[in-house]
């Protein structure tokens, strides 16, 4: 079995990627403290063609050497904005017509594998701080909670790993894939 070179993968250029349709998902980072995690979010959002990232509170913003280390340039291909508070970001996104979801273990959360995205709907998914999770005041403002089913003793994943799991679930939904450039 021969590995495929990057050139043979036929990836779009940053300019082509900017013009391509995106998944109707915006990722909101609620006070993420690790710059490496922020970079991983950028890279994951690029891989799954998320619309944008909204960085909030203490979450670091590009340009940053530490973010770049894990983003590998995705901080330049995924649109992003910054809000001083996550509350402001959630309010703005709600006004833009997004359904707001907390990726968190909360009462009434839907298990990710049972969640059914609605065609034509835009989603803003809030990922919380590495220690405290999504702030309670933000969870209170969300339309729904999403929980990743787990079997281990920790019932916890690194926040950027959680992003990969959740965004893959949205990306793999045929109802949301319309127009996406999905590789091999």
Go through each PLM region and give its residues.
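Post-transcriptional modification and biogenesis factors for structured RNAs
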Residues: 1-184
């Amino acid at each position: 079995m021969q590995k495929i070179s990057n050139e043979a993968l036929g990836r779009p250029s940053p300019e082509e990627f900017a013009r391509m349709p995106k998944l109707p998902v915006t990722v909101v980072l609620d006070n993420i403290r690790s710059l490496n995690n922020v970079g991983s979010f950028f890279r994951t959002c690029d891989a799954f063609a998320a619309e944008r990232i909204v960085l909030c509170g203490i979450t670091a913003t590009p340009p940053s050497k530490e973010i770049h280390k894990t983003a590998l340039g995705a901080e330049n291909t995924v649109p992003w904005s910054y809000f001083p508070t996550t509350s402001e970001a959630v309010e703005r996104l709600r006004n833009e017509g997004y359904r707001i979801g907390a990726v968190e273990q909360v009462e009434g959360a839907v298990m990710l594998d049972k969640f059914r995205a609605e065609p034509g709907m835009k989603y803003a998914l809030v990922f919380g701080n590495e220690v405290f999770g999504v702030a309670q005041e933000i969870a209170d403002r969300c339309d729904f909670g999403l929980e990743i089913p787990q079997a281990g003793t920790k019932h916890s994943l690194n926040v950027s790993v959680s992003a990969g799991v959740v965004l893959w679930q949205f990306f793999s939904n045929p109802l949301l894939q319309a127009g996406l450039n999905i590789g091999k």
